[in-house]
Amino acid sequence: MVYIINMNTILNALAEPNRLQIVELLRDGSLTVGEITDKLGMNQPQVSKHLRVLSEAGLVEVQPIANRRYYKLKAEPLKEMNEWVQSFQKLWEDRFDRLDDYLQELQRKKKNKRSE
């Protein structure tokens, strides 16, 4: 049950477009609030609020270096989310296989009608 609660927290955090953009920026490496602000054209309080939500969801961590705070992605929650999504892969594959079988059957019927 903890797994589902954690996944809900992560998905809720990522559902907001600005937070998703921040995660995409951090994918390429650590950034300060100021750097994120410049790249997104948002004001500093907005970015800080979004970073706090991402941090509370466990997606981002802070590294203080000298007088700056660098934000970076935490790999583990993203790995968990990837595993969760992959758990649906068998379902998708089965459905695509059934669809393929159905389409092949339709083609066979169509060919049989033409030959009659």
Give, region by region, the residue ranges found by the protein language model.
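C-terminal regulatory/oligomerization modules of transcriptional regulators
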Residues: 1-8, 25-39, 44, 56-61, ...
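Short helix-coil-helix linker/hinge
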Residues: 13-18
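Pre-recognition alpha-helix immediately N-terminal to the DNA-recognition helix
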Residues: 20-22
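Short, hydrophobic-biased segments on the C-terminal half of alpha helices
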Residues: 51-52
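Short, Lys/Arg-rich nucleic-acid/phosphate-binding segment
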Residues: 64-70
